[in-house]
Amino acid sequence: MKRTEEIQAESLPSSHPGNARRWAVPEAVKLYLIVSAGSVIGSVLRALASIGTLAWLGPGFPWGTLLVNVIGSFVIGFYATLTGPGGRVFAGTRQRQFVMTGICGGFTTFSMFSYETFRFVQTGSWPMAGLNVGVSITTWLVAVWLGHMVASRLNRLGGV
């Protein structure tokens, strides 16, 4: 037999606060959905950047992958520093995960970098493979450092 409270809750509209407990979404699920949404945005931006770079610079070198990974490295260095402890901008866990894990994770692509390097090796283009690895790793590290430095500078400015 149902309790009086259960019968009353069933008769309430779904938007009624009394039904909130039945429709509560666990925090972990909310975080996964937020990261997923960021990943969709990042992936679409990556596709657009790669297509645009291919049309602009041609297929001789994986410029699109290099570009998205440099931009993503800068953004994650910038955002992590700007929103980190002592940062100028407060961002909660969800916001940080949305940008850093979702958007940056969907935008950057280590797997494509690995594949493109492998293809150079497979076709005997060892100099291009070495160039790809050297230029990529160097520019990614410089970009994350620059992002960190710009955000550190902003964090020291007064105001906001």
Regions found by a protein language model. Name each.
Residues 1-160:
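Membrane-interface helix-loop junctions in multi-pass transporters/channels
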